């Protein structure tokens, strides 16, 4: 069962709130490098699914390995930049204030930009499934 419209509206509202400019000089939390899980729990409007939200603080030019998720991913860029590649599509550069939805099962990868990446990502995860599934790099064949 896929999450319904109420789940998507709630996620969109949450991401929209992140885009509201704040006062100058407001201190911003700086988590340790990596992905810090900040929220996780069941979604009442989508039985059989739970939401995981992460605060991403990725160092400059760090690779984002090939992977996919069993549920949808919603990524909102707060600072820095990232290059995302979805299998079968070209590179996409995302900058502060931009967001992307990645469909379930879509193999994707990328790298943080030259100044690193700060972002918030939310994943709608079917119960009993892992958050992320690693996908081995495709070997380059001679002549390609």
For every predicted segment, state its role.
Residues 4, 18-52, 85, 95, ...:
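A short, N-terminal "cap"/entry segment at the start of jelly-roll beta-barrel domains
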Residues 6-16:
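Bacterial N-terminal signal peptides
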Residues 47-49, 61-74:
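A short beta-loop-beta micro-motif enriched in histidine and acidic residues
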Residues 58, 88-105:
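Short acidic-glycine-tyrosine-enriched beta hairpin
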Residues 63-65, 83, 100-110:
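Histidine-centered metal-chelating micro-motifs
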Residues 70-88:
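Glycine- and acidic-residue-biased ligand/ion/polar-headgroup-sensing regions
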Residues 104-130:
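Ligand-binding loop in jelly-roll beta-barrel domains
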């Amino acid at each position: 069962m896929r999450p319904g419209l109420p789940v998507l509206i709630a996620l969109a509202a949450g991401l929209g709130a992140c885009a509201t400019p704040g006062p100058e000089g407001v201190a911003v939390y700086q988590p340790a490098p990596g992905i810090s899980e900040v929220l996780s729990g069941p979604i009442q409007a989508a039985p059989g699914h739970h939401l995981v939200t992460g605060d991403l603080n990725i160092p400059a030019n760090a690779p984002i390995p090939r992977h996919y998720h069993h549920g949808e991913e919603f990524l909102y860029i707060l600072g820095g930049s990232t290059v995302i590649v979805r299998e079968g599509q070209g590179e996409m550069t995302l900058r502060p204030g931009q967001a992307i939805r990645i469909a379930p099962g879509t193999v994707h990868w990328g790298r943080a930009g030259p100044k690193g990446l700060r972002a918030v990502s939310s994943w709608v995860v079917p119960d009993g499934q892992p958050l992320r599934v690693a996908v081995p790099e495709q070997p380059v064949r001679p002549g390609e």
